[in-house]
UniProtKB/Swiss-Prot annotation:
This is UDP-N-acetylenolpyruvoylglucosamine reductase. Pathway: Cell wall biogenesis; peptidoglycan biosynthesis. InterPro entries: FAD-bd_PCMH, FAD-bd_PCMH-like_sf, FAD-bd_PCMH_sub1, FAD-bd_PCMH_sub2, MurB, MurB_C, MurB_C_sf, Oxid_FAD_bind_N. It catalyses: UDP-N-acetyl-alpha-D-muramate + NADP(+) = UDP-N-acetyl-3-O-(1-carboxyvinyl)-alpha-D-glucosamine + NADPH + H(+). It comes from the Bacteria.
Length: 291
C-alpha cells in the first residue's frame, strides 16, 4: 500500500515514541516532514486523495489510542529560524518552543520567556495558544504561515486571527501551521525571568514521570489543579495512570499506563467537579483510533 503514495511513508510506527505520555499503539502510516516543500507535496496529495490524517509535533499535548491511529500520522519536524529585523523572528513550526524561548531570553530578547516551560513545537504552541501566567503565544505573534486544505501556502497577519485562552482558529478550521513570526523586545532581564519560571515549574510539576502536561483548562478565575486537590483526588491511581500528588492537573504514567487508565481518571475528575457545579474542559487532545 505504501507504494501508492508519491512520497515515502512508514507503516506500523509506535506512537508511544512520539508522545510525552509514552502511550499509543501503531500508526497505520507515518510520515516525517522535514521541509516546507515536502509538506506542500503531502497536502496537495491529500487534497485529491482523501485519507484520515493527523498532524503531531512533539506529542506533548496528545493522548493516543492503545490501538494506534488508522490513517496517516504527519510528524512535523520542519525546523529553522531567521531574524527579519532586529526584533522580529520567523520560526518554522517544527522547532522546539522551549529551546526557542531559552535561546532568545539568553540573548536578551523578551517576549517568549514563558516558552521555556512548554515542551511542544512552535506549531503546537500556536495551535493551542499555549502559555503561562506570564503570557501566551498570541501575545507576541505577528504573522502565521499555513498550508490550507488544498495544499496552498498562505500568510495571515495576527490581526486576522482570533485567539483566546488555550484557543486558536486552527482548532476549528484545520490547517498545517508552517511558520510563526514573533515580535520581541530587548531586555537584559529576560534570561532571569526565564530561569525563575523553569525553576518554579520543576518545583511544582511532576517532570519525573511521562505526562501530557495540564489535562484541563483552568475555569475562568480558578485553578483546575487547586480544584482537583480540594476534591481530594490527588494521588488517585487506576492501572498505570495516576493523578499526580505534586500537581492535581497532571495525570502521569507511572510505568505501564494504557489509554483507558488515563481516560477513566479524566472522567472521574470531571464527574467529581461537576457535582460541585464546576465543568472542566480538556486541554489535552484525545486522538481516537479512527476519526
Amino acid at each position: 500500500m505504501t507504494d501508492s503514495f508519491p512520497f515515502s511513508v512508514q507503516e506500523s510506527v509506535p506512537l508511544s515514541r512520539f508522545s510525552t505520555f509514552r502511550i499509543g499503539g501503531p500508526a497505520r502510516y507515518f510520515k516525517e516532514l522535514t521541509s516546507l516543500s515536502e509538506a506542500l507535496t503531502v497536502f496537495s496529495y491529500l487534497h485529491t486523495h482523501p485519507l484520515p490524517y493527523i498532524i503531531i509535533g512533539k506529542g506533548s499535548n496528545c493522548l493516543f489510542d492503545d490501538q494506534g491511529f488508522d490513517g496517516l500520522v504527519l510528524y512535523n519536524n520542519i525546523q529553522g529560524q531567521e531574524f527579519l529585523s532586529d526584533t522580529q523572528i520567523k520560526v518554522l513550526s517544527g522547532s522546539s518552543f522551549a529551546l526557542l524561548g531559552k535561546r532568545l531570553s539568553s540573548q536578551g530578547f523578551s517576549g517568549l520567556e514563558f516558552a521555556v516551560g512548554i515542551p511542544g513545537t512552535v506549531g503546537g504552541a500556536v495551535f493551542m495558544n499555549a502559555g503561562t501566567t506570564l503570557a501566551n503565544t498570541a501575545s507576541s505573534l505577528i504573522n502565521v504561515e499555513i498550508i490550507d486544505h488544498s495544499g496552498i501556502l498562505l500568510s495571515i497577519p495576527r490581526e486576522k486571527l482570533l485567539f483566546s485562552y488555550r484557543t486558536s482558529p486552527f482548532q476549528k478550521k484545520p490547517a498545517f501551521i508552517a511558520s510563526a513570526t514573533f515580535q520581541l523586545t530587548k531586555d537584559p532581564q529576560a534570561a532571569k525571568r526565564a530561569k525563575a519560571l523553569i525553576e518554579e515549574r520543576i518545583l511544582k510539576q511532576p517532570y519525573e514521570y511521562p505526562s501530557a502536561g495540564c489535562i484541563f483548562r483552568n475555569p475562568e478565575g480558578l485553578s483546575a489543579g487547586a480544584l482537583i486537590d480540594r476534591a481530594g483526588l490527588k494521588g488517585l491511581k487506576i492501572g498505570g495512570g495516576q493523578i499526580s500528588e505534586k500537581h492535581g492537573n497532571f495525570i502521569i504514567n507511572t510505568g505501564n499506563a494504557c489509554t483507558a487508565d488515563i481516560l477513566e481518571l479524566i472522567e472521574i475528575i470531571q464527574k467529581t467537579l461537576k457535582k460541585q457545579g464546576i465543568s472542566l474542559h480538556k486541554e489535552v487532545r484525545i486522538i481516537p483510533f479512527r476519526l
